[in-house]
Amino acid sequence: MHMLEKITKENDIKQIERQDYPALAAEIRDFLIEKVSIHGGHLASNLGTVELTMALHAVMNFPKDKLIFDVGHQSYTHKILTGRKDAFETLRQYDGLSGFPKRNESPCDAFDTGHSSTGISAAMGYSIARDLCGGDEKVAVVIGDGSLTGGMAYEALNGLAQLKTGCVVVINDNNMSIGKNVGGLSKYLNEIRLGNAYNELKTGVESSLMGSKTGKKIAKVLKRSKDNIKQFFVPGMFFEELGITYVGPIDGHDINQMITTFQHAFRLDKPIIIHVKTKKGKGYGYAERHPDYFHGIAPFDRISGKVLAAKKTSCYTDIFAKKMVKLGETHEDVVAITAAMAQGTGLVRFEEAYPKRFFDVGIAEQHAVAFAAGMAAAGMVPVVAIYSSFLQRSYDQILHDVCLQKLHVILAIDRAGLVGQDGETHQGIYDLAYLSHMPHMIVLAPKNRYELEAMLDYAYAYDGPIAIRYPRGSAYKGHADIQTPIVYGKSEVIQEASGVAVFSCGHMMEEADRLVERLEAKQIPVTLVNVRFQSMLDTELLDRLMKTHTVFVTLEDTIMQGGYGEKLHAYLAEKNSPEQYTFISGAIPLPSVPQGTIPELRHHMQIDAEGLAEKIVPCYKKHLK
């Protein structure tokens, strides 16, 4: 690690000789493979952007200049080059180094990211603010070709073209072919279009021609001729038509070429797109051959490439995927929709079985939901599978296009609740709060693997908008012997006693079982309720339990505001005087939740069995007096 030892703070890369950059890139790759193999994280995308990030750092000056990473999972090299190499020992751990850009982690991180297609808008904001304040800082954004399937990216490009602010947009193309390089002529045209002489001449000629009626006609003919030539030779014609200079494709592993290109681009005070071709997973054979598998990966053995994990058990995503195939077989009106998450949501199985009834719309959650609404209006039964963290992007479509029309759209919300080490931007803790107040929407959550299947059957039969929330990770097998029919608005009583009533929402049942065990060990009688319908109360059950219970506890995987417990507490307050009962919330008390393992996070917030038991015991004893 000879070269890497010289990088202790931002801008240190400028002290390294250009001829040594390839050696530094190799050391960075080796370092990334080592650290991600230990801690897990996003590997393939970071291996592919080493030279690209180095080239930007060689040209930019941090923290004055602003570099934004769309999505942000490809920012590891940026973190290394800004003095955070040693912090990789805590990558994605509680109170450790984030796997995404974080402004509170370093002044060199210009903008927090985690979701797709937002980067160009943020960079445009920085550029306009600079112009208004008379600054001279460079602004650049790195966005992947996958993120260009999100409509927001094009909204931002349109804005850039209109405002003409100086901003460099680097398209990191590691998969989807945007355009084909036609060799020397393409390179020659790129060099010309980046040159000052060309741009000054172009501006002068256009101004002169537009000064007269004849000149305008000549300009129109010239533009038509230019467009015909460029349409044949220049792969970025689409961007040129928007009014943004396009350069590329260029080799994303040729540091010298990228440095030269970036230097020229930053000198021009206008929006420029630089299309860079990279190889995802570069430098690690397993990641090159299986880039999707090594996109986000758990700790693994770097020699064999195999994940170091406990014996695999079925997860909720697997259960969902298998059940979807069965639903598709039984019901020909079932269609499946996802937003660039066919693998992650398990819908690849449905795609293989029923390719004509499967639709991956790309990173376009808004479109996915409105598309589903149209299908539902036409008599189909669409199942939209999206991660909780990304579903919030389609809020308006769920409300306006689905709920107000009471359309039969099934939302399969994967990664609901705490997801752990990806941090604030990926926790699935907000969906219930915004879904439960929508007209006609009902939200369910299964207590175990078996109930997820039953809820999907219920969702198919239900005539209206319905959402099912389930987490990442192993599917709970507990209470397999208790499978009562699902009835609208009704909770399920697992065991009934008196004194303490515990209401468990969805997969929190496993934690609830641990809580019940702790309380019963202290001779405290417990009623355990499987909530099932998180968006509504079973008031008939509550009225009965209020006669024999004094302590009411919820275990929830969502934020407190707008959660199930908030509704429960309000109902208790309406029906009782304060001295008659105690309510203890096991919902998430924080507005945002940092990275960490799920047990760590629950313990920190005191919403695990241990923390809740400590609150319950004294309250129960108080009511005995």
Regions found by a protein language model. Give the residues of each.
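N-terminal amphipathic, basic-rich helices that act as targeting or association modules
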Residues: 1-81, 240, 244-246, 251-255, ...
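Long, well-ordered, tryptophan-enriched scaffold segments
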Residues: 4, 175-320
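Cofactor-binding active-site loop characterized by glycine-rich and histidine/acidic residues
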Residues: 42-163, 333-334, 338-339, 347-348
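Non-catalytic terminal/interface segments that mediate subunit docking, oligomerization
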Residues: 66, 278-280, 284-391, 397-406, ...
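A glycine-rich helix N-cap at a beta->alpha junction
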Residues: 87-97, 162-176, 197, 403-415
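Structural signature of the thiamine diphosphate
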Residues: 218-286, 408-413, 432-481, 609-625
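Glycine-/acidic-rich phosphate or pyrophosphate-binding loops and their flanking alpha/beta elements
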Residues: 260-263, 295-296, 315-330, 346-352, ...
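Peripheral docking tails and interdomain loops at the edges
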Residues: 299-302, 307-312, 420-422, 442, ...
